[in-house]
Amino acid sequence: MYLVITKSYPPEVGGMQNLMWGLTNSLSKYFMIKVFADYQDQHQNYDKEVSFSIERIGGIKLLRKYRKAHLVNEFIKNNKNIEGIISDHWKSLELIKTNKKKICLIHSKEINHNEGTSLNKRVLNILNNVDHVISNSEYTKNLAINCGVNSSKITVINPGVNPAKELNKKTIKEAENLLKNKSPRLITVSRLDKRKNHEKIIMALRNLKQTYPNIIYTCIGDGDEEENLKQLVKELGLDEQVLFLKKISQDLKNTLVAKSNIFVMPSIFYKKSVEGFGIAFIEAAQYGIPSIGGKDGGAADAIEHQKNGLICDGNSLDEIYSSINDLLNDKKYLEYGKIAKENSTKFYWDKIIEKYKKILN
């Protein structure tokens, strides 16, 4: 049996949550799995779907880490068939007392602390004493090595996706009503925060509008930058070109992606935060939609430059504008989109899980 300790798990929404849900579901086909996850409202809707055990830990957030560690330690003490522990975050392993095999996933931001600081020392104390460190991209692997993690412990395994669901007629109609026959169509699905760089996409849109007066940019997500971005759209007179949506169904989100031409997310460094991988690029690729990503972070693991999309400098407005214009010119996005769709299958969970099996076996 393998124990999975996670801070990020459905029904909470996000890339990390999707990763841990996909990983545990896929692992359970080959191993006995027990998950220790944070309590979430309506978790029963998810927990009843699976064949493995999920233990939810509630209470005050500050004390939850200690309660979870106590439960895990007690479970290990009372069960002799534990083969190892898989954790989504180094902090989840700090209080675990066992000699069993330990595997820790790393994503980028959570390990990015200056050398010699107390946080850096805590990170290294955990990661250099586990059996395996799983990095979500080559970028994150190099970041970990630069932070002092032993390179021999690190294996790169990109996050997986499940095959895309077929679109249904009802949501296709709903999406087309929202898009109002406008074209070309750009889209971003992410939190609205500084790192995702929506601001520069909107600024590039002002120039693109001169060539493509019917262009539309759909922003799906919410976050701290929402009001600032809406104000920018108003100031630039782009109300007819930008569509903000949040808290929509997964089906509608997928349909809006599938009915777009280019997925745009040229992420940048912001403080300590950086894009570790970018699973949203793969989710778009499944529908034949090419992506434009930023050179900062791990987007290059998902986007092959000038094959299934473009990598640009997210700090350069000119590069973002040129990249979008390049893909729209002669509808080059169709050619890149075809390659993106073919390439996306290598990220299916049934292939990704084989890499985990090699480590666990």
Task: Describe every region a protein language model picked out.
Residues 227-248:
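Nucleotide-activated donor-binding/catalytic signature segment of Leloir-type glycosyltransferases, i.e.
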Residues 305-306, 310-317, 326-331:
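Conserved acidic donor-binding segment of nucleotide-sugar-dependent glycosyltransferases
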Residues 258-273, 289:
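Acidic donor-binding loop of glycosyltransferase active sites
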Residues 6-13, 19-64:
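N-terminal strand-loop element at the rim of the active site
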Residues 86-92:
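Short His-centered aromatic/hydrophobic patch
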Residues 139, 160:
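Carbohydrate-associated surface elements
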Residues 3, 134, 178-196, 202-205:
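Conserved donor-binding/catalytic core segment of Leloir-type glycosyltransferases
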Residues 184, 214, 241, 319, ...:
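A short, well-ordered alpha-helix in the C-terminal region of glycosyltransferases
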